[in-house]
């Protein structure tokens, strides 16, 4: 497996979907603008534009789990469906990755660098996507 692939990550939510892009070579990720969702349904044209612009080799979707590692009845199946739709609509290779505590970590990082003003919903969601993606890199390569 090449370690110079580009990877796009999504932090799925019912109102907002965080987005980040990263490189396996460096193991780092950067936030992109969060996408709006209406009751969990994104604008698929916006997803398509992001995929066309960044042309990732892989897409990682955060998998919401409870602290014990079990599925959350209200959101986990929807995140899985979102991942399956990305694969089905766009033919992307998609992996799910445990996103436990990613929002907590994202808020802490944003607050550290920008105080309360940095804690907007879109910033938090895309920073969560960064945390998910960097955690995925860490799991792959230690």
Swiss-Prot record:
Residues in coiled coil: none
Keyword Nuclease (UniProt): yes
InterPro entries: RNaseH-like_sf, YqgF, YqgF/RNaseH-like_dom, YqgF/RNaseH-like_dom_sf
Keywords, comma-separated and alphabetical: Cytoplasm, Hydrolase, Nuclease, Ribosome biogenesis
Enzyme Commission number: 3.1.-.-
Any one GO BP annotation for this protein: rRNA 5'-end processing
Main localization, broad class: cytoplasm
Recorded GO CC terms: cytosol
Disulfides per UniProt: none
Top-level enzyme category: hydrolase
Database matches in SMART domains: YqgFc
Protein family (similarity comment): Belongs to the YqgF nuclease family.
UniProt-recorded name of the protein: Putative pre-16S rRNA nuclease
Organism expressing this protein natively: Photobacterium profundum (strain SS9)
Taxonomic placement: Bacteria, Pseudomonadati, Pseudomonadota, Gammaproteobacteria, Vibrionales
